[in-house]
Amino acid sequence: MTNELTFNSDWFTHNVPALEAIMADLKPSKILEIGSFEGRSTVFFLENMLNIHDKVEIHCIDSWLGGREHIQSGWDMNGVERQFEENIRTFLHSFNEKKECKVVKRKGYSHAKMIELLAQGYENYFDFIYVDGSHEATDVLFDALLAHRLVRGGG
């Protein structure tokens, strides 16, 4: 295990300015992330939440099978999933131990996993939901509809 985070792609950083403003305004302590890939956005959210709260929670939904763009580009999705796990493990070993940080990996398709969360009583639970899973229009719409049920009022 290394002590450094490793990311082989960056489809996230361009979102940081807008997300920093959202984080500063909402101050979420419970996030649902749809699409985690190697964990770059997961780490961003954890760092931001831990700057504000002593107890944080993030649920990460991803199939780690890849979308059309990953398959066409020849991504090793098993390797991507392993990198996610390594990055989260590395991050968790590096943060302030006086704070409580819960990361829940939920492997599977977002629609099924979000319905599962609803069935488990997570309706109106999350402060913020980040949707960056499938890039197919119908999938994104369904993710947004389910997210509406899972996010708390004002989130």
What annotation goes with each model-predicted range?
Residues 3-5, 10, 14-155:
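S-adenosylmethionine/decaboxylated-SAM
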